[in-house]
Amino acid sequence: MAPPRNVVKIAVQMRDAIPQLIQLDQAKPLAAVLKEVCDAWSLPHSERYALQFADGHRRYITENNRMEIKNGSILCLSTAPDREAERLLRGLQSESREGRREALRHLLLLAPDLTFAREVISRDGLQRLGTIIEDGDDLGEVLALALRAFLELMEHGVVSWETLSIPFVRKVVCYVNMNLMDASVQPLALGLLENVTLSSPTLGQLVKSEVPLDRLLVHLQVMNQQLQTKAMALLTALLQGATPAERKHMLDYLWQRNLRQFIYKNIIHSAAPLGDEMAHHLYVLQALMLGLLEPRMRTPLDPYSQEQREQLQALRQAAFEPEGESVGAGLSADRRRSLCAREFRKLGFSNSNPAQDLERVPPGLLALDNMLYFSRQAPSAYSRFVLENSSREDKHECPFARSSIQLTVLLCDLLHVGEPCSETAQDFSPMFFGQDQSFHELFCVSIQLLNKTWKEMRATQEDFDKVMQVVREQLARTLALKPSSLELFRTKVNALTYGEVLRLRQTERLHQEGTLAPPILELREKLKPELMGLIRQQRLLRLCEGTLFHKISSRRRQDKLWFCCLSPNHKVLQYGDVEEGVGPPTPESLPEQLPVADIRALLTGKDCPHVREKGSGKQNKDVCELAFSVSYDHGEEEAYLNFIAPSKREMG
């Protein structure tokens, strides 16, 4: 006769004892189960003991998670979490260095378990770890273990980072600023300061004032990937917490110290593969760099500004008055105004008063900046563009100013200028670190591409929007290739001619039409059962191979990874935390299990609980597109296993 549904057959182990094979009644209180297990081994005081999962992080069994125990689970009897917390915290005060080290190692092993973490925190465990960190008696392994345990306990969110004391933060800053320091300590100290900076504006200002940018540059230039990554993480956190003016000042200083060149040569083009966390921080740095353009993009031209009027005149003169010659010399004021208005029209402005064209935001003054940069950095190309088009028939001239204004809007859109940083994105473009003034340089390439495409399309003024659509496609396709330099971008985008764009469009259209043709649809319907079987096999195979996922908190992107896969018999989802840089784990080594039979539903996008918790906003859009959750039975409640897919391709 089969056992009742709420009874599971499990094994319970204890050191130096013969394991027990028992039938666990999930309806029975856990205290009663513990007493029965202890009685079988003649152990008094069952309240001093607890059950743990025998593998992985050895999580404690509680009334909240006991439904995760399944048939065949192996548990072990161990000291209750409150008593274990007390024992280890006493060990931290040992006069023996080895005793403190062993206590810290064991504490670190159990710290990921929330039940144990709460017991430690309630007994002032964070303060005791803080004392070890502040005293700094041992700058080697003991300090590294204390920092790691402190970070693990704080990760549970039971205590806010804002509660940390100023002396404690200053001491951690000292470890970052010290020259001779154990290699395992500084990445942990940097990681702790990153958390502080992102979570507390007040303490973030303290970190900003006491960690010199030069010190972070030193850490970035050490050939140690972990140290580089944590230094970059703190740098981007400091930049994100700064005001726009402070951010500009900081980035200007970093660029003067050749950080851009170092990133390009020694991080992006390093022989070692770029880690996901570093890729994310480079994306954030790129977004912050481009974000400096936002004030100009949001500011319309002021017709009463003498400086801006002079800039417009400089733009006109560079095209029509070479080498400082004044064409309007000797003319009356009215004739001179009429001549200037005509030349501004030839320059491609829609209005005789160009200030009216630049009142639109975006792109505001950023479009004027781009045009001036092009006229000064590529004067020959600029004058050739303007003079060629101003001498063509009216219908076929490519309006430089109108094109520049629209192209600036297009580039800002493609590069997400002014949008909040994503929490998950890693899609930085290497060429932005390979070039000074990268946005303006990209504009110079793009405006010449636009002129070339205009000619290839034999466009007229009525075709302006069509030309812009083609240029958008040319730029988007080339940017998606992530060229490593501006020169490579120039080569690739110029090779993508209007004819090539048409060919690609036609190929894609024919592919779509072909797949929807009646004979194809009929054949597909006939083969559907076989195809569905193959698709099912392929998907099961992919699920069995497993995938690495990033852990995402409501505050920031985490550097922790976890792995999930389907068991070979397709009955259980197996998952657990893994270290970055380590190969995919074997299913047997993963500590957590979720029976497929317990799964209720698959949720995606806004229906996922971890997306609902994060709220709305632009920064949440990409998370929403990549989010999915598995809901499952957890006792009488519904629980969730939450995922953020690595990419849209994986999500598909």
Curated annotation (Swiss-Prot):
GO MF entry, a single one: SH3 domain binding
Location(s), subcellular: Cytoplasm
UniProt xrefs under SUPFAM superfamilies: ARM repeat, PH domain-like
InterPro entries referenced in this protein's UniProt entry, alphabetically: ARM-like (IPR011989), ARM-type_fold (IPR016024), ELMO_ARM (IPR024574), ELMO_dom (IPR006816), ELMO_domain-containing (IPR050868), PH-like_dom_sf (IPR011993), PH_domain (IPR001849)
Gene3D superfamilies: 6.10.250.810, Leucine-rich Repeat Variant (1.25.10.10), Pleckstrin-homology domain (PH domain)/Phosphotyrosine-binding domain (PTB) (2.30.29.30)
Annotated ranges, domain ELMO: 307-479
Cellular component GO terms, alphabetical: cytoplasm
Coiled coil residues, start to end: none
Keywords assigned by UniProt, alphabetized: Apoptosis, Cytoplasm, Phagocytosis, SH3-binding
A GO BP entry: phagocytosis
Family annotation (Pfam families): ELMO_ARM, ELMO_CED12, PH_12
Function: Involved in cytoskeletal rearrangements required for phagocytosis of apoptotic cells and cell motility. Acts in association with DOCK1 and CRK. Was initially proposed to be required in complex with DOCK1 to activate Rac Rho small GTPases. May enhance the guanine nucleotide exchange factor (GEF) activity of DOCK1.
Quaternary structure, from the entry: Probably interacts directly with the SH3-domain of DOCK1 via its SH3-binding site. Part of a complex with DOCK1 and RAC1. Interacts with ADGRB3.
Protein name: Engulfment and cell motility protein 3
Gene this protein is translated from: ELMO3
